Amino acid sequence: MRTHYCGNLNKSLAGQTVELCGWVNRRRDLGGLIFIDMRDREGVVQVVVDPDMKDIFPIANQLRNEFCIKFTGEVRVRPDSQVNKDMATGEVELYATGLEIINRSEALPLDFNQTNSEEQRLKYRYIDLRRPEMSDRIKLRARASSFVRRFLDENLFLDIETPVLTKATPEGARDYLVPSRVHKGSFYALPQSPQLFKQLLMMSGFDRYYQIVKCFRDEDLRADRQPEFTQIDIETSFLTSQEVRNVTEKLVHDMWKELLDVELGQFPVMPFSEAIRRFGSDKPDLRNPLELVDVADLVKDVEFKVFSGPANDEKGRVAVIRVPGGAKLTRKQIDGYAEHVNIYGAKGLAWMKVNDRAAGMEGIQSPVAKFLSEDVINGILDRTQAESGDIILFGADKAGIVAEAMGALRLKLGTDLELTDTSAWAPLWVVDFPMFEEDGEGNLHAMHHPFTSPLGVNAEELKANPAAANSDAYDMVINGYEVGGGSVRIHSAEMQTAVFGILGIEAKEQQEKFGFLLEALKYGTPPHAGLAFGLDRLAMLLCGTENIRDVIAFPKTTAAACLLTDAPSLANPASLEELAIAVKLAEKKEQA
């Protein structure tokens, strides 16, 4: 039906007759002529309809926004005075000789000239996606997928599919369950990741695997999460963790160079413990210059129990953030930051303004200064390298609360005070994660997943002191977002059984849930390691947006609903009967 895309017309086509298909982006009547800005996925071009073209001029008079149309015409170069530098095709226009209305459009439920609610945009997503901004995002995501396939193919990886209907395994989030009609009362689970199947592929001899695959997690949602998401899944045999990082770092480095013409440079490597200590997060945003500084040793002996209590608790922490120029913050602003850290479990936010460093104690303004000696205050000022005009903010509590609360405060300060360099890219690797973490009741859980190999210990050593073990795991972080995570996997049945035991999975349950894996590990399993990227999150960063829904064609809401199709919906009673399922809905309480 067409010979060219609207957005691809240029001066090299001058004098040629072309056929274009697309939509009316805008119509203008000027000096007897009708001007149509015609749009397709590649861009917009101006079409001129002359009243002398008597066959098509009356049809052009009928055109309204979003009519689906076809134009035939001659590409003409615009006079210099009429060149539109705001359009990629602004040097040319199409002089129409033929016009067909393919389909008319009713008045749109969305207004492209104003901000529409997200609910409206999701309900009429097929219209929202016509906007050039959205179209460009989806196209950039497609280019990213294409680049990944090309890169991995060239590096001898094999694209192999794994099952979507599989068995429920504990991987941290709730599974989406699918009832079996044949095996009544039994359920499949949609995969949270292809983790075990890709490990089995390594055992099968396919030493370099990848897959761009849908994964499903029934978890609470936020701006950068969806119930169904796309993963770039990678697994290798006979590569060390460093070698896996080298390959996957090059993938991202080359992707940014090709798609954005950005040179990321070599990614720094940071141990988990350093990330938590300096930034309060295992996915630090290095564009933000603020850091946490530990001062527990300086306040151990003060009478102020808010500080000395955590300072003398082996599980406690006292840390501060120095905010350059922060002395200008008002009490109302400081109270707002106190409310912010409360969200993360902190009980308050002590502060100290350094109005004049040279004036000694006279230059200090703080509600807690009266509880601290001059030596302690000077020690804090020296350690943080505080200067006149700065403010120091304190966090004192259990170490986990301090890290989370002060880490979140650091990010908010960086945004509010424009300290974070939003024009920069700051990738890094975070490595040497703890193998296990406590759940608050003394039980251990795998920090990543139970198939991650410990670092530098055998099974007996791991069982003797599991809480002290680190894992051979690694996360790639860009601008504060974890975009990929991976690890060396356990490749011996002895070690896998030991890890299951530490996690409280008894022998019988091990066989019920993971018997196939433990059996497979007996037959010459190679050492293997891998990584999975979140394609949605990578695309979000590439497109410069902060909402993952902006780079997914048909996303769900934060309530895991599809406003376009009204999914999820009640099932047909006959279908439920065939599946031997009875649905019991909670009764709604009557309002008084």
Curated annotation (Swiss-Prot):
Quaternary state and interactors: Homodimer.
Residues the record lists as binding ATP: R217, D218, E219, Q226, E482, G534, L535, D536, R537
Aspartate: annotated span: 195-198
Ligand binding (L-aspartate): E171, R217, H448, R489
The gene coding this protein: aspS
Protein name: Aspartate--tRNA ligase
A cellular component annotation (GO) from this entry: cytoplasm
Cellular compartments annotated: Cytoplasm
GO function terms (MF aspect): aspartate-tRNA ligase activity; ATP binding; nucleic acid binding
